[in-house]
Every structure is written in structure tokens, then in C-alpha cells.
Curated annotation (Swiss-Prot):
HAMAP family: LarC. This is Pyridinium-3,5-bisthiocarboxylic acid mononucleotide nickel insertion protein. Its EC number is 4.99.1.12. The keyword Lyase applies. PANTHER family: NICKEL INSERTION PROTEIN-RELATED, PYRIDINIUM-3,5-BISTHIOCARBOXYLIC ACID MONONUCLEOTIDE NICKEL INSERTION PROTEIN. One of its GO terms (biological process) is protein maturation. Involved in the biosynthesis of a nickel-pincer cofactor ((SCS)Ni(II) pincer complex). Binds Ni(2+), and functions in nickel delivery to pyridinium-3,5-bisthiocarboxylic acid mononucleotide (P2TMN), to form the mature cofactor. Is thus probably required for the activation of nickel-pincer cofactor-dependent enzymes. Keywords: Lyase, Nickel. It comes from Clostridium kluyveri (strain ATCC 8527 / DSM 555 / NBRC 12016 / NCIMB 10680 / K1). It catalyses: Ni(II)-pyridinium-3,5-bisthiocarboxylate mononucleotide = pyridinium-3,5-bisthiocarboxylate mononucleotide + Ni(2+). GO terms for molecular function: lyase activity; nickel cation binding. It comes from the Bacteria.
Length: 399
């Protein structure tokens, strides 16, 4: 499995991301050729060069605008404030000759920033005027990111917790705290760290690249590193102003996720309540809920309630446990969940199309299962046994 890993020890910005991925191996000629399909070549020039920050050698990207009036992005290159709206950005991308995949990735990142800006300024998506995103160089940053990600053809993208910096920064709205409100909104439910330097180390553009493309945020590296790229930032800081990226190979074909188990022992709750509690836990994002009969002190029978969650699901699950059960304490365990690769397909039967889930181990199909809820609904509608529907699905696929 091919892995792209972002090591954001000094945050991430759009230009540093482009520089790091070029340094990793994306040919600059390929990037420039693809960017030319956006039909904005006359509005900017891209300078790509080798650079050094505190002894670390990497690639630096600088986008210079062919405009007389310039602003400045806090982390990197210049910005000219066109004040474009989302529909303008969408028109530019959709009218380009980029591949559909690159278009979709690009539009996803722009939408992420648009939603954040709309919420911060209390406006609808169609009303938002982009300052950072409306600038040509930010279009280059985000479309360029999509081009590079598509070129690398990785199976998974992972990132470390994101350093966002600290202090205050001046923008078109005045002096605002770091991380900027838009950056904070984009990075919701993503692990961050702050204050390593008094500077904006992560910009909204960089945050959107991570929020849209990264599947997992973890400091753990469980793959062999094959290539390393360094994207050099423009500002001199106390630490290396560098974005480091790894291209690696994970030997196991199974997907591994870090998850958590929250568990509590209960011996004084009405057992009728467990069904409701379980429903509420799933509603707030629990990945799994299970109950184990136990004997507690003084021989009292009880239940061990266990809830499997992702890192970002803890708060809502704890709210349900403490508000809906008699528990006054919860234990938390970090676990690794190893999952087989899987896909879904439709099987045509005499009762209609039914979804089946296929699971693979070491590249071989090892599990094949119809979706229970679909089979149950058909069984009720047709007044036939669910076992018969399962057999029809298996027989149809064998044929």
C-alpha cells in the first residue's frame, strides 16, 4: 500500500505543500503543463528553486503575480485580492481541461474554505467574497495540490497533528489571533498543536489541503519510508520553516486505524434503558457498542458497557454515557483496529438489486456477504424467508 505522509511540525501553507511534493518527485514540468490547462498563465509566474532553512535543503516555490497591486499571505507568497466568489472559482476550474479527478479534488478544497469563510462572516456561500482563495496564487496552490496528489497515485494520505503557531497576524479585516478563524474552522476535529513560534505556521489554504485529502491524523509511522520531500517556507523562524512529506510503502494490505474503547461497569440501571442508550451512542458517532455480562463486588450481576470510538468522537459519547446511564466513571483504552480491504457492488436478482460487501486478504477475496438490512426489507415486502434471499444472492453471483 502506497502512503503519503505529511509531517506538519511547522504547519503547512499552499506554497510549502507544492514545494514539498515537487521535492518528493512530482516533475515540475508536469505540474506546469497541467496548471496551464486552467488558462491563467498570463496572470502569474512560478519560480521553483533549491533553498535551505537551518541546514535543511529542499525546494521553494514562489508565485509572482503579473499585477501592480499585491497583498501578502502570512506564510508565503504574495496575494492580489480579486474578491472572487465561489461560483467564479468553480467556473475557472470547470472550464479548464484538467481531469475530472483533479477538478473534484480542487473544488472540494475550495468548498471547504468557502464553508469556513461563510460561517465566520455570517454569510451564505454565494455571498462570500474570497480574499485568500480569490487570489491567483491560491488558485495555483490548491489546483497544484490536486495535480500533485493525483500524480503520486497513493492509496492513503496520512498526516501528523498540525502545528498552527501562535500570536497575532494582520489581514484585511484587521489584527486577528493565530490560528486565524477560518483556519480554526477548517481544522475542526483535527488534532493541532500551538505556540511553537509566534507566527502563523498554518494558513487556511494549507488547512484545506489536509482537511479534504487526509484520511488519518497520527504521529505513528508504520510504513517504510522510500522518499522524503522538503518544502521550504519563506520566513526565517526559530525552527526550520519546512514542510516534510514522506512517500512510503506499507507491507500489510489491511487498513490499520487508531481507535479508542470507552468502557464502564454498571450494576444499578434499569436494563430496559440499554436499548435506548445504545441507539443514542450510535447516533452521536460510536463505531461499535457492545455489552458484556459481569459479576461485580459483593457478587452483584452487572454489565460492562464498551463503546468503540474514533479520536474525535469522545466528547459526544461521554455526554451520552454520563447523562443517560448511572455510570460515574469511564475507562479509556487506545487500540488498533485492523480491517480487511473491502468494496461494495450490486447483484441483480429476481427480487431486485442487492448490495454485497466483499472483503480481501492479501489480494484474495475471503468474505462475501449480502447487506442484511436490504435483504430484511425485501423479505418483509415479498413475504419470503430472509435465508432464501441470501441463497438467491449467492447463487446469482456464482452464475
Amino acid at each position: 500500500m502506497k502512503i503519503l505522509y505529511y509531517d506538519c511540525f511547522c504547519g503547512i501553507s499552499g506554497d510549502m505543500n507544492l514545494a514539498a511534493l515537487i521535492d518528493l518527485g512530482v516533475p515540475k514540468e508536469y505540474l506546469m503543463e497541467e496548471l496551464s490547462k486552467v488558462n491563467l498563465n498570463s496572470e502569474y509566474e512560478m519560480k521553483i528553486e533549491r533553498s535551505v532553512k537551518l541546514g535543511i535543503t529542499g525546494t521553494r516555490v514562489d508565485v509572482k503575480l503579473n499585477e501592480s497591486s499585491h497583498g501578502e499571505e502570512e506564510h508565503g507568497h504574495d496575494h492580489y485580492h480579486h474578491h472572487r466568489k465561489l461560483k467564479d472559482i468553480e467556473k475557472i476550474i470547470n472550464s479548464s481541461h484538467l481531469s475530472d479527478k483533479v477538478k473534484n479534488i480542487s473544488l472540494g478544497m475550495f468548498m471547504k474554505i468557502a464553508e469556513a469563510e461563510a460561517k465566520i462572516h455570517g454569510k451564505s456561500l454565494c455571498e462570500v467574497h474570497f480574499h485568500e482563495v480569490g487570489a491567483i496564487d491560491s488558485i495555483v496552490d490548491l489546483v497544484g495540490a490536486a495535480i500533485c496528489i493525483d500524480y503520486l497515485k497513493v492509496d492513503r494520505i496520512i498526516a501528523s497533528p498540525v502545528q498552527v503557531g501562535g500570536g497575532f497576524v494582520e489581514c484585511s479585516h484587521g489584527i486577528i489571533p493565530v490560528p486565524a478563524p477560518a483556519t480554526t474552522e477548517i481544522l475542526k476535529n483535527i488534532p493541532i498543536s500551538t505556540g511553537i513560534v509566534q507566527f502563523e505556521t498554518t494558513t487556511p489554504t494549507g488547512a484545506a489541503i489536509l482537511a479534504v485529502n487526509v484520511e488519518e491524523f497520527t504521529s505513528k509511522i508504520d510504513f517504510s519510508i522510500e522518499k522524503i520531500g522538503y518544502g521550504i517556507g519563506h520566513r526565517d523562524l526559530e525552527i526550520p520553516n519546512v514542510l516534510r512529506v514522506y512517500l512510503g510503502e506499507q507491507e500489510r494490505s489491511e487498513k490499520v486505524e487508531e481507535q479508542y474503547i470507552l468502557e464502564t461497569n454498571i450494576d444499578d440501571m434499569n436494563p430496559e434503558f440499554y436499548e435506548y442508550v445504545q441507539e443514542r451512542l450510535f447516533e452521536v458517532g460510536a463505531l461499535d457498542v457492545f455489552k458484556t455480562p459481569i459479576y461485580m463486588k459483593k457478587g452483584r450481576p452487572g454489565i460492562n458497557l464498551s463503546v468503540l470510538i474514533s479520536e474525535k468522537g469522545e466528547k459526544d459519547v461521554l455526554d451520552v454515557i454520563f447523562e443517560e446511564t448511572t455510570s460515574i466513571g469511564v475507562r479509556k483504552h487506545k487500540v488498533e483496529k485492523i480491517m480487511l480491504n473491502r468494496d461494495f457492488s450490486k447483484v441483480k436478482t429476481e427480487y431486485g438489486d442487492i448490495t454485497v460487501k466483499k472483503s480481501y486478504y492479501k489480494g484474495k477475496l475471503v468474505k462475501y456477504k449480502p447487506e442484511y438490512e436490504e435483504c430484511k426489507a425485501i423479505a418483509k415486502e415479498k413475504n419470503i424467508s430472509i435465508d432464501k434471499i441470501y441463497k438467491v444472492v449467492y447463487r446469482q453471483d456464482l452464475n
